[in-house]
Amino acid sequence: MRRFAASFALLGFLLSTAAVAGGEGRVCKVLPQFLDKKGRQSLSPSLYERDAYQAYLRKHPQLRTGLRLEVLWKARGVDWGKTKLRAELRGLLTNSLETVTLEEPVKKSGFFGRWAEFNLTGDEFGKFGKLVAWRVTLWEGDRQLSEQESFLWSGVPAR
């Protein structure tokens, strides 16, 4: 009985310290994908088909009408009213480096991570050029919880 009480007290202590530490979150995965004229990144739900279609769109830039960043993220213990994802994209058009920042509030959902989308389409995509680097961050108010960036992000200066 004493072991049970001690275990219960230890569990209560650990849970209370986790609550005091504040929220935590993580950007798990970022997938940049081109969109075709119908707004699709794939012709079917198959991952193989998606990768093959993305390779086809890379070889045929005239068929691209947009860019989508699919972001897998997760968070817990955060103030959901202040939590947001921010995507920063750097593109090269002729000799001009363009930086676009997109933000999206996140909503509480399930225990596991959730996917969010950032779309760059229309005139914005036409002025953006070729994607050179990206960075996605998860924020709770003014506090950055997590970050994931492409390997070229640090090597490409912002303008």
Where are these regions (language model features)?
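A eukaryote-biased signal for short, well-structured alpha-helical docking elements
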Residues: G22-S44
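Contiguous beta-strand segments within globular domains
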Residues: S42-K82, G113-L120
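Short beta-strand elements
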Residues: Q144-R159
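Extended low-complexity, serine/threonine- and proline-enriched intrinsically disordered segments
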Residues: D79-T99, V136-L138
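Internal, hydrophobic beta-strand segments that form the core of beta-sheet-rich folds
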Residues: K130-E147
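Short, solvent-exposed, Trp/other aromatic-anchored flexible loops in extracytoplasmic proteins
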Residues: K107-K130
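Solvent-exposed serine/threonine-rich low-complexity stretches and specific carbohydrate-binding patches
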Residues: E98-S109, S150-L152
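Bacterial N-terminal signal peptides
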Residues: S7-S16
